[in-house]
Design a protein with these regions (language model features):
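Formylglycine-dependent sulfatase
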Residues: 3-434
Length: 434
């Protein structure tokens, strides 16, 4: 990635990662989802058309953090130890993280968001691979990889597991994890002493399932997806052509999901994409706060901001069975949780106020007591124009948008342009260290 990097300077570096977001899910890559802040960064920066991840949450994070292939970092797959080299499911001690390299070089190192490179998440378990022990000076986020956006599991500040409802340092009117991640990223910038440059890793869980969003954001997308997935996919493809993002020789890949006219639960399916869009929209809103903090402190000019996703859109069938399923066999006896209770379940049995968690086609998604994925057909839209999904090593699984913004380091003639040079996650650490 040396084509736009000036090796003489020491800029601040911010890497923002979305979770389970497809190649076409932001405006500057063809989406109808409103992402004005990312679009602004793209207009004044660079967009990569052939940037690749590893197709799955944990391997991507291991590769990003260490600048090595995931097997070299010990996480060739997920968080289970198979007994085979490269598959211990825990970040190796024989690799150094980007924070461990930048910190001795007098960079301040901050992380807000998802970690997901160790299985050791429970109280009393080893913290040797938690962020503070791997080079980050400040950390707020989740050690595990997925969970409720209204009550995320393994939420941690520094080295201490916390409940969002008993956290004296952060008490918003409504807790929503995407906001919490962006608010803490903004806090780290505001509280940075300015003596040295900083590295900030902003690792979102949005728009990974569950489909959780705030009502006002969902309302914004009401009716936007009534035409169904084929129409939305075609519109994205046409916008990509108009933007010059793809060569006209690239055609839409064959679909492997049911036609919209055969969808059994159209209203239910539409709701999923409305919520998904709201999740991406909210992520972008928070990015606007981060950019605003940089502008207020006059840091934007010499801050390299990189936005990527960990893998393509996800076709997993989370919570999509017919009917209604409860996460507890006797939902009537559930009791509210205490504010101090730690949430350690990826799929909680209940909300904080004691409402049972529900899944299935008879449950409209979006609220704290629901838990769904948006399914194969919408994931196919997310990955326009490619085929396959997260898990696969086809373009739909491993292609990610990459937006790079650095006013002081990217030449004016390159701004708003596309970079067609292929690149991979392992290039990011080397680029930052250089």
């Amino acid at each position: 990635m040396s084509s736009f990097v000036d090796g003489q300077s020491r800029p601040n570096v911010i890497i923002v990662m979305a979770d389970d977001m497809g190649w076409s899910d932001i405006g500057c890559y063809g989406s109808e989802i409103e992402t004005p802040n990312l679009d602004r960064l793209a207009k004044n920066g660079l967009r990569f058309t052939q940037f690749y991840n590893t197709g799955r949450c944990c391997p991507t994070r291991a590769s990003l953090l260490t600048g090595t292939y995931p097997h070299q970092a010990g996480i060739g797959h997920m968080m289970n130890d198979t007994g085979l080299p490269g598959y211990q499911g825990d970040l190796g001690n024989d690799v150094r993280t980007i924070a461990e390299v930048l910190k001795p070089a007098k960079y301040s190192t901050y992380l807000s968001g998802k970690w997901h490179v160790t299985p050791k998440i429970h109280p009393g378990s080893s913290q040797h691979n938690w962020p503070i022990q791997r080079g980050f000076e400040r950390f707020y986020g989740t050690i595990h990889g997925a969970g409720s956006f209204f009550d995320p599991n393994s939420l941690t500040r520094g080295n201490t597991l916390i409940s969002p409802y008993a956290d004296q340092e952060y008490q918003p009117e409504v807790f929503y994890y995407t906001d919490a991640i962006n608010d803490h990223a903004t806090r780290f910038i505001n509280e940075h002493d300015g003596k040295n440059p900083f590295f900030l890793y902003v690792a979102h869980t949005a728009p990974h399932w569950p489909m959780h969003a705030l009502p006002e954001d969902i309302e914004k997308y009401k009716g936007r997806y009534d035409a169904g997935w084929e129409v939305i996919r075609e519109a994205r493809y046409q916008k990509q052509l108009e933007l010059g993002l793809i060569d006209p020789k690239i055609k839409l890949s064959p679909r492997d999901a049911e036609p919209w006219k055969e969808a059994k639960n159209k209203e239910w399916e539409i709701r999923h994409m409305e919520v998904y869009a709201a999740m991406v929209d909210r992520l972008d809103q928070g990015l606007g706060k981060v950019i605003g903090a940089l502008e207020k402190r006059k840091m934007l000019e010499d801050t390299l901001i990189i936005f990527i996703a960990d893998n393509g859109g996800c076709a997993e069938g989370m919570g999509r069975r017919e009917g209604i399923q409860y996460q507890d066999s006797d939902p009537e006896i559930l009791r509210p949780m205490k504010a101090t209770d730690l949430q350690m379940d990826m799929i909680p049995k209940r909300t904080r106020d004691g409402v049972v968690m529900k899944q299935g086609t008879e449950v409209m998604t979006g609220a704290a007591d629901t838990y769904h994925g948006y399914g194969r057909a919408w994931a196919n839209v997310s990955n326009t124009p490619f085929r396959e999904y997260k898990h696969w090593v086809h373009e739909g699984g491993i292609s990610t948008p990459l937006v790079a913004h650095w006013p002081k380091g990217i030449a004016p003639k390159l701004r708003g342009k596309f970079e067609h040079q292929p690149a991979h996650l392992i290039d990011l650490m080397a680029t930052c260290v250089d």
